[in-house]
């Protein structure tokens, strides 16, 4: 279930996911 949720979330946000990833890294 978690894998599917992450897949849908990543698909919906797409580019935004990268922005959030950078925020998490920083």
From Swiss-Prot:
The keyword Ribosomal protein does not apply. Keywords: Basement membrane, Calcium, Copper, Extracellular matrix, Secreted. GO terms for cellular component: basement membrane; extracellular region. It is found in: Secreted, Extracellular space, Extracellular matrix, Basement membrane. The keyword Phosphoprotein does not apply. It comes from the Eukaryota. Belongs to the SPARC family. Appears to regulate cell growth through interactions with the extracellular matrix and cytokines. Binds calcium and copper, several types of collagen, albumin, thrombospondin, PDGF and cell membranes. There are two calcium binding sites; an acidic domain that binds 5 to 8 Ca(2+) with a low affinity and an EF-hand loop that binds a Ca(2+) ion with a high affinity. This is SPARC. It comes from Neovison vison (American mink). The gene is SPARC.
């Amino acid at each position: 279930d978690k894998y599917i949720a992450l897949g849908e979330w990543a698909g919906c946000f797409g580019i935004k996911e990268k922005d959030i990833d950078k925020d998490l890294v920083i």
